[in-house]
């Protein structure tokens, strides 16, 4: 099932008319507000590279390399590589309102390509783009205000405007501050402190820019005294989750536990109140009050599915707590592929648990069609993890893993059948510790090694199997 749906996704990426969207970017004539054309190339590049590498698909990889080269070659000397017209931009207005959101995915695409292939040109392009933002935004420079109001006049004011630099004003600066994530990631890759300092500056000003102390009040969410939906007048799921990933990245770098607490507390609140039984989140793209989760209409946005999955994976990596892997399993088994047309590969904008969608509902491309292909391409990066001698099986599906010093395969028809067989094929490190996720929903888990039952199994935990593998 997984392999087939990933193949459908790969074929969709091959056939997707990415040329015209790359044309749109490199021609650089865009002045309108619309963002859907200018976010396609970033998501497609990352998706295509990952999908091609996973299956050694030369045709797709060649196409991805060609498109990437066109984009990188078009980068201006200043570092700008978005779609906005040069005539539109100036020192006082160096970006379009939706540039930050569009370029978020370009940043991640460049860095992913570098990490997967070692392509230094991609890393250089990411640095040049980051330096463009650092040149114009920072202490004493331009800031991510969501409207013309400034502190303190913006305190507790509802906004319905289009921000000059931070996307939709109704996001209260968070559609600009989301750049803290890829630029902090750039610090992780390069070690250049200017990128860390800039990301910390961004996060440190969210309260001021939003006018609602939305960042600080995440502590109240963590305390259980405030719902995440009450942080500001409109809490856009996908946008908040992109920012949350930046906060977690900064926690990983700095060790600031307050950042982790904010995000983990928000995740718990969302999971307990706003996550559907199918694992998805968002009602008309935002978080609702109480336990309101309509099962029809515009609910469970695919962009939110993508960032919720990524955010949950980051929390799993940081904590090793299986509740995060359980949530990812629920989402992966249900809403991720429910959003995909199993024939054409196109992904939906919203996927309600109830009702039907006509064939022509698969429109686009838009933000969500591209997000659907990106999350499917990212899936293999969530299945397993390795940390020194420890190897973690986070998700169960028929598959084969061939690592540098460890190889195994999993067979069985999970989840239709709850029995799976994991066969270790080779292990150069004979003392590898195999950590198996025991799902919390599994009431009577059983594990055997070479026919011998293992004791001490606890649902909702990882079971560590230590032995000398042959």
Question: Positions of the model-derived regions?
Answer:
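Glycan-recognition and catalytic cores of secretory/periplasmic carbohydrate-active enzymes
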Residues: 1-470
């Amino acid at each position: 099932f997984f392999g087939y749906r990933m193949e459908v996704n790969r074929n969709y990426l091959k056939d997707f008319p990415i040329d015209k969207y790359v044309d749109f970017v490199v021609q650089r004539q865009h002045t309108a507000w619309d963002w859907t054309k200018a976010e396609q190339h970033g998501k497609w590049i990352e998706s295509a590279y990952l999908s091609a590498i996973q299956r050694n698909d030369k045709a797709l990889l060649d196409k991805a390399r060609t498109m990437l080269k066109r984009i990188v070659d078009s980068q201006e000397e200043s570092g700008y590589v978005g779609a906005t017209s040069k005539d539109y931009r100036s020192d006082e207005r160096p970006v379009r309102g939706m540039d930050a959101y569009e370029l978020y995915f370009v940043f991640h695409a460049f860095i992913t390509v570098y990490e997967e292939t070692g392509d230094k040109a991609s890393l250089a392009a990411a640095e040049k783009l980051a330096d463009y933002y650092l040149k114009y935004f920072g202490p004493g420079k331009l800031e991510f205000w969501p409207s013309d109001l400034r502190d303190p006049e913006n305190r507790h004011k509802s906004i319905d405007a289009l921000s000059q630099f931070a996307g939709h004003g109704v996001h209260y600066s968070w559609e600009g501050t989301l750049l803290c994530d890829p630029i902090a990631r750039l610090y992780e890759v390069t070690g250049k402190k200017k990128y860390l300092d800039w990301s910390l500056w961004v996060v440190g000003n969210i309260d001021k820019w939003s006018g609602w102390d939305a960042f600080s009040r995440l502590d109240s969410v963590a305390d259980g005294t405030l719902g995440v939906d009450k942080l500001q007048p409109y809490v856009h799921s996908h946008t908040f989750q992109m920012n949350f990933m930046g906060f977690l990245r900064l926690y990983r770098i700095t060790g600031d536990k307050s950042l982790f607490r904010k995000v983990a507390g928000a995740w718990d609140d969302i999971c307990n109140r706003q996550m559907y039984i199918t694992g998805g989140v968002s009602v008309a793209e935002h978080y609702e009050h109480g336990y309101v989760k309509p099962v029809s209409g515009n609910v469970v946005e695919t962009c939110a599915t993508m960032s919720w999955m990524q955010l949950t994976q980051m929390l799993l990596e940081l904590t090793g707590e299986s509740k995060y892997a359980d949530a990812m399993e629920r989402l992966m088994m249900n809403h991720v592929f429910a959003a995909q047309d199993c024939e054409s590969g196109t992904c939906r904008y919203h996927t309600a648990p109830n009702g039907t969608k006509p064939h022509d509902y698969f429109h686009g491309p838009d933000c969500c069609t591209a997000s659907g292909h990106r999350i499917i391409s990212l899936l293999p990066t969530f299945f397993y993890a390795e940390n020194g001698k420890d190897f973690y099986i986070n998700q169960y599906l028929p598959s084969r893993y061939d690592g540098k010093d460890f190889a195994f395969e999993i067979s069985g028809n999970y989840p239709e059948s709850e029995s799976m067989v994991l066969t270790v094929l080779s292990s150069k490190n004979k003392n590898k510790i195999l950590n198996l996720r025991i799902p919390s929903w599994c009431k009577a888990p059983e594990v055997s090694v070479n026919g011998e039952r293992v004791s001490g199994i606890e649902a909702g935990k990882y079971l560590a199997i230590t032995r000398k593998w042959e």
